[in-house]
Amino acid sequence: MNKNLKVLALKYRPKIFKDLIGQEIIAKTIYNSIKHDRSANAYLFTGIRGVGKTTIARIVAKSLNCLKGIDNLCSEDLCENCNAISNSNHIDVLEMDAASKTGVDDVRDLIEFSRYGPTSSKYKIFIIDEVHMLSKQAFNALLKLSLIHISEPTRPR
């Protein structure tokens, strides 16, 4: 089978802010906050299935960690960081599907992962898909994680 074959939704998934359709306001707002080094500690994207919440989260992760900078963001994943983020194998970007990992132990793994600074990029980023599916205990542990980092934010190297 040909390794170049991809599902159309993945093949044409937006890779940079200007490729987003129907999300212009949020894309411009987040783009400007990153460009002016005023990004938030966390972003929460809501909406119905298929509107691009995870896609925007990946674009934000790329924008924060692209080796070329936000103005020259890799639309074809040319830099090492953007390529790794697109392939879900970047060491500093952890993507978790909370629909299948709903337990407190899964969130404790996130807490353990967050104890150390980024190793190959500016920021360590967590993308938690379907966060509403976490158990009450897991959500409380996640809240504890966010409180730790809000009170003691880590700045990039």
Which residues does each PLM region occupy?
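Conserved RecA-like P-loop NTPase ATPase core
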Residues: 20, 30, 45, 54-57, ...
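Walker A/P-loop
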Residues: 2-6, 35-36, 40-88
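Pre-Walker A (pre-P-loop) alpha-helix and adjacent loop at the N terminus of AAA/AAA+ ATPase modules
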Residues: 3-48, 111-120
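Helical "lid/switch" subdomain of P-loop NTPase nucleotide-binding domains
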Residues: 26, 103-106, 130, 134, ...
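Single conserved hydrophobic/aromatic residue that forms the stacking wall/gate
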Residues: 148-157
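Short glycine-rich substrate-engagement loop in P-loop NTPases that contacts/grips substrate
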Residues: 91, 98-123
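Conserved P-loop NTPase "ATPase switch" module shared by AAA+ and STAND
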Residues: 118-134
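Loop/turn-to-beta-strand initiation segments
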Residues: 41, 121-125, 139, 151
